[in-house]
């Protein structure tokens, strides 16, 4: 039962992390593209971007002030700019490998080992190709992978 709970938690986290990653990535692009922005412009654009990717299912009444500087909790913005998107890219690759394994375990494992054997000798798109997964971050591809995760979640 504990294993099931842990799996459920991990799969739910996988689904919910992507909007946050997109928010952080888009916001930091805006910040660097507008180096002379004011504090007020930063606040306005953060909230605009946050609302673009956030769900309306949560009532944030009374927390407006907190939301306006919530971006500060993401230390990557300060310590390793433009790195946070890497987590999303890696997670999508992992889901693609998992889906491939679920569809064809033998081929999935073979492709996984092939990708691993190349290590850092190839570009990321080439590693994805060697592993038999698409280096594709289109809404359609992400939707396909999220449906797969949702289906796996429902099996628990």
Map each language-model feature to its residues.
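C-terminal, non-catalytic "cap/extension" segments appended to globular domains
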Residues: 1, 21, 25, 33-156
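Helical catalytic core of nucleic-acid polymerases
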Residues: 1-10
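A short helix-loop-helix "switch/interaction" segment in the helical subdomain of ASCE P-loop NTPases
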Residues: 11-15
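Conserved binding/catalytic microenvironments
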Residues: 29
């Amino acid at each position: 039962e504990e294993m099931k709970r842990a799996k459920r938690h991990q799969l739910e986290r996988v689904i919910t992390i992507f909007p946050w990653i997109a928010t952080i990535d888009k916001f930091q692009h805006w910040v660097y593209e507008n180096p002379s922005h004011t504090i007020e412009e930063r606040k306005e654009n953060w909230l605009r971007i946050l609302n673009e990717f956030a769900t309306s299912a949560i009532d944030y009444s009374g927390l407006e002030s907190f939301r306006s500087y919530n971006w500060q909790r993401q230390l990557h913005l300060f310590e390793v700019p433009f790195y946070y998107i890497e987590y999303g890219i890696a997670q999508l690759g992992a889901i693609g490998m998992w889906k491939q394994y679920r569809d064809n375990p033998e081929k999935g494992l073979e492709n996984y080992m092939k990708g691993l054997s190349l290590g850092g000798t190839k570009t990321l798109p080439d590693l994805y190709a060697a592993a038999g997964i698409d280096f594709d971050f289109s809404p359609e591809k992400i939707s396909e992978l999220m449906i797969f995760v949702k289906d796996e979640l429902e099996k628990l």
